[in-house]
Amino acid sequence: MINNALRTLISSATEQSLDDVLEHEFRTAVQLQQMDQFEWHQVEADLWKRTCLGHEASASFNQNIAHGHTELSLMTSWRVHQPSSSRITGSELELDQLVARVRQAWIQARYLRPEVGVELDTHTDPTVAQTMCYRLLRDEESIQEWLDETFVVKRLGDPGVATPAELCAYTYNRPLATKGKKSMLYLILPRLDDEQRTAYTIWNVSHAVTDGGSLAEVFNTLFQCVIDATPSEPYDSIYTPSAFELNVLPRMPRSVVMAYRQQYQPKPEEIAKAHKVAEVNMRMITEKMGESLALMPSTSWPERKHETVCLCRELEANEVRELLKFAKQVHSGITYLASAATILSAAETFPERKASSKGALVGMVRNARRWISATPLDASLGASTPLGSDAVFLWVPIDTHKTLEPSFSRMQELVTTARHIRHELDKHLTTPHCISSYPYVAESSIQGLNQQWSQIKAVQSPSSSSSQKEIAGIIGAQAPGFSSVGMMRIRPRFEPVSANARASGLWLERTDFTHTGRQINASPWISMFNVDGRIKLQLGFDTKFHEVEKMNQWLDRTVVWMRICAAAAATTSTSVSSTSVDATAPVFARL
């Protein structure tokens, strides 16, 4: 195919010298080869493969070298409302049918949302590319083998499942054990005496193939398949995928970098500028860390064991309405107020940093899908880009030589900090060409991770005699981070496609969602999302590096700031100045 393209170029050349043409053709061939490896290509019958690109690569490498770091455990609670004429409600037969429904839906999701079935490399060689592959399963035997590895059914009250949270904690306190880090689905059945008949699903998945902006699409697909399934005896039979489902290539997960390159065709100068901006951002972390507010890991971390703890706090819908009202009154957004609260709360949780600080570094997540067309530009290429997020760091000036404890009297400090965050973040949301820097940033991250984990292993070896200064040089002060997912768009109600089934009164109600994950590093971030009008603030961290008490204090202070904002909504017009706040800032600046 490439040779044919070269011949066409040569035959059409008129005024160019042959040398110029050959040089151009060589560059074109190299570019085509490079592009091909990042798009799905068939390597054998029913086996597709591509090279990870950008943050897919660094997420996969991080997962490998850090024993499962950032693997997600995403839990939903839900119930199936049976038709009023049903006689199986509250029976073992209802649970048998529930298992059959979810098993079929999990199989269908593997074809309809292929990231569910993707396999990733597990090596830790920084010089070898990370790749992903997808095997198309056609026969009952291979599907059953995949189910045996990835689908687990538990009942509430079983050992290790006293509560759904207990099983969820199990999933994020061990790395995925499946071959190629394939994702898993846990189904927790209700007790027979549970009048609400609430079931739970936990999707345990690599962060390399999903993020907070795309995971809702998987759950929406899964639950629609659950309610559309028509279980019948024998309930352990294996679903046979349809011809449409088997035509999986158009739905395969695509790198957001490749989608960007196809849509925008960046010029060399645009790529170079993006690399420069990214380089400056990474260098700023080193330059500013010494004068920044920060989280302080325990100095005894070499002797401690890894354990992930996930904390969650919730603002009720009425509080969220008042919080939104306050944000509008001060011409800000909940994302900016919450990230400002994260910084100020870190200052008082680790006050030992205040005297030497002139402000704060803060990591913020941005979503590249804001710039990517939802419509495929090439019918042969999939439009799904399930990993579209990355992080940038901002420098926020703050007067640290005073108390920053949550208080109504210090509301102006919070609003001013939120204003600075918005101003700085806007600088990173002006052009899609920032996506050009993702491969460069990812490669830098991989090299840094490899070096850091080599140092960690050396310090933890029995023969190590490292000083406290050397230990602090490996794991030192950590900038706080904030990730705003926005609205979690998992639908609350799912009705069957079949008109007869709908008319019978059969439907599925999704009642809650919780976002947790495995943390095996010293840099905890607070995340925030809105589900059903409620805001959840969540914090996952590694007790090897951080004390549970300190992390509770950090999250609690952040939530107190949010509640103060909500309570202040009625009096803001006279209490908090909005001078110099730009009310016309672009909508896309909101995460």
Swiss-Prot record:
Disruption phenotype: Abolishes completely the production of mannosylerythritol lipids (MELs). It holds the Pfam family Tri3. The C-terminal PTS1-type tripeptide peroxisomal targeting signal is required for the import into peroxisomes. It comes from Mycosarcoma maydis (Corn smut fungus). This is Acyl-CoA-dependent acyltransferase MAC1. It is found in: Peroxisome. Acyl-CoA-dependent acyltransferase; part of the gene cluster that mediates the biosynthesis of mannosylerythritol lipids (MELs), surface-active substances that enhance the availability of water-insoluble substrates. Mannosylerythritol lipid production is responsible for hemolytic activity of Ustilago maydis. GO terms for molecular function: acetyltransferase activity. Residues 589-591 are annotated as: Peroxisomal targeting signal type 1. Its EC number is 2.-.-.-. Keywords: Acyltransferase, Peroxisome, Transferase. MELs not only have high potential as eco-friendly biosurfactants due to their excellent surface activity, but also have attracted considerable recent interest because of thei runique properties, including self-assembly, anti-tumor and cell differentiation induction activities, and moisturizing and hair-repairing properties. The keyword Transferase applies. Pathway: Secondary metabolite biosynthesis.
